[in-house]
Swiss-Prot record:
Transmembrane segments: none annotated. GO terms for cellular component: autophagosome; autophagosome membrane; cytoplasm; cytoplasmic vesicle; cytoskeleton; cytosol; intracellular membrane-bounded organelle; membrane. Dimer. Part of a complex consisting of CALCOCO2, TAX1BP1 and MYO6. Interacts with MYO6. Interacts with GEMIN4. Interacts with ATG8 family members MAP1LC3A, MAP1LC3B, GABARAP, GABARAPL1 and GABARAPL2. Interacts with ATG8 family member MAP1LC3C. Interacts with LGALS8. Interacts with TOM1; the interaction is indirect and is mediated by MYO6, which acts as a bridge between TOM1 and CALCOCO2. Interacts with AZI2. (Microbial infection) Interacts with Lassa virus protein Z. CDD domains: Zn-C2H2_CALCOCO2. The lineage of its organism: Eukaryota, Metazoa, Chordata, Craniata, Vertebrata. Zn(2+) binds at C422, C425, H440, H444. A motif (CLIR) lies at residues 133-136. This is Calcium-binding and coiled-coil domain-containing protein 2. Belongs to the CALCOCO family. Residues 381-390 have a biased composition (Polar residues). Residues 362-390 are annotated as: Disordered.
Length: 446
């Protein structure tokens, strides 16, 4: 097997993983005569795109990986892949690099990833034989050849079965190898992380060691200072022991004073108890006074509420009284108006109001005794009784067609319901709405 200066890209990809149909080899002979150059013709399929480091190698039939090439040639990239002629390419192998034996070989197209994209039919490198020679064989030789052929077929089948078994084992081994490679990559990654962690830990320990050394030096210096400090504290302790003796003596004196103070405290406690009892009685008295005051305030509030209600009612009565007074004045004005109207009518009839025997009563009782339907009586009743006028002098009433002119205006006013005028806003209410009138007047006082 011969190699060039730069080896092509290969891989350990099995035959099962290759795509032999993407590059098609054309015009491949059954055998090539040794000593001459060999031209390899091939065609790219529609969806295949060649790359710069693709190559075509000559492999012995039965090869397993692309590393088992005998010789190879780099592929020439076409300028325009869309052109039909660019799909058909060729490469020439020099006679010097071709095999010298008569084994079966084949062309294989391998891409830059080391994957086989096409393979040709097998061929040989041998001289041309005389194919026109007539060979005469006996029947026994034919049977022997047939028997030998059967044995070869059987052996071929066994070899195929063995090849399939080996391919399966190889596939399992490839899967196991892939798994081991993944585990190796994982372990390498973990190893790198651990190495990095160990380095970081080492740096941390070195830093911590330096810090501990510095702390040790500081502690040694502080230890010397503490020795001096201990001597000073011992001297202070002796002084404090003497002071403690004085304090113990003073404590005894304080204890005696405390006993005396406890006795005085007991006496004061008894006095305080008596004072608390007196204070409790005073609190009860104050509470009783507060209750009495609360009761008095409630009564005062009730009286104030009652006084307010009475004042409210008084205001309402005053308002109603004023309203009635206004109504009375209005009625008196209407009465005067009616009197003037009667005088005018009497003058129209040729009578004198002062010469009438009956005057208009000024009270409601007089009017009621004369005629319950009239408020002021009939001013013409006396005239009818005193004199009997002639039929020619009697005038007809234009309203009721009576023999005398009747005062229907007064009757119409008497038949109308009594009205109430608001003394504040002069709003008029019917006599049937007396309660509404009172509420309206009361609202003005709020």
């Amino acid at each position: 097997m011969e190699e060039t200066i730069k080896d092509p890209p290969t891989s350990a990809v099995l035959l099962d993983h290759c795509h032999f149909s993407q590059v098609i080899f054309n015009s491949v002979e059954k055998f090539y005569i040794p000593g001459g150059d060999v031209t390899c013709h091939y065609t790219f399929t529609q969806h295949f795109i060649p790359r710069r480091k693709d190559w075509i190698g000559i492999f012995r039939v039965g090869w397993k990986t692309t590393r088992e090439y005998y010789t190879f040639m780099w592929v020439t990239l076409p300028i325009d892949l869309n052109n039909k002629s660019a799909k058909q390419q060729e490469v020439q192998f020099k006679a010097y690099y071709l095999p010298k034996d008569d084994e079966y070989y084949q062309f294989c197209y391998v891409d830059e990833d080391g994957v086989v994209r096409g393979a040709s039919i097998p061929f040989q490198f041998r001289p041309e034989n005389e194919e026109d020679i007539l060979v005469v064989t006996t029947q026994g030789e034919v049977e022997e050849i047939e028997q030998h052929n059967k044995e070869l077929c059987k052996e071929n089948q066994e070899l195929k079965d063995s090849c399939i078994s080996l391919q399966k084992q190889n596939s399992d081994m490839q899967a196991e190898l892939q798994k081991k490679q993944e585990e190796l990559e994982t372990l390498q990654s973990i190893n790198k992380k651990l190495e990095l962690k160990v380095k970081e830990q080492k740096d941390y320990w070195e830093t911590e060691l330096l810090q501990l050394k510095e702390q040790n030096q500081k502690m040694s210096s502080e230890n010397e200072k503490m020795g001096i400090r201990v001597d000073q504290l011992q001297a202070q302790l002796s002084t404090q022991e003497k002071e403690m003796e004085k304090l113990v003596q003073g404590d005894q004196d304080k204890t005696e004073q405390l006993e005396q103070l406890k006795k005085e405290n007991d006496h004061l406690f008894l006095s305080l108890t008596e004072q608390r009892k007196d204070q409790k009685k005073l609190e009860q008295t104050v509470e009783q006074m507060k209750q009495n005051e609360t009761t008095a305030m409630k009564k005062q509030q009730e009286l104030m509420d009652e006084n307010f209600d009475l004042s409210k009612r008084l205001s309402e009565n005053e308002i109603i009284c004023n309203a009635l007074q206004r109504q009375k004045e209005r009625l008196e004005g209407e009465n005067d108006l009616l009197k003037r109207e009667n005088s005018r009518l009497l003058s129209y009839m040729g009578l004198d109001f002062n010469s009438l025997p009956y005057q208009v009563p000024t009270s409601d009782e007089g009017g009621a005794r004369q005629n319950p339907g009239l408020a002021y009586g009939n001013p013409y009743s006396g005239i009818q009784e005193s004199s009997s006028p002639s039929p020619l002098s009697i005038k007809k009433c234009p309203i009721c067609k009576a023999d005398d002119i009747c005062d229907h205006t007064l009757e119409q006013q008497q038949m109308q319901p009594l009205c109430f005028n608001c003394p504040i806003c002069d709003k008029i209410f019917p006599a049937t709405e007396k309660q509404i009138f009172e509420d309206h007047v009361f609202c003005h006082s709020l």
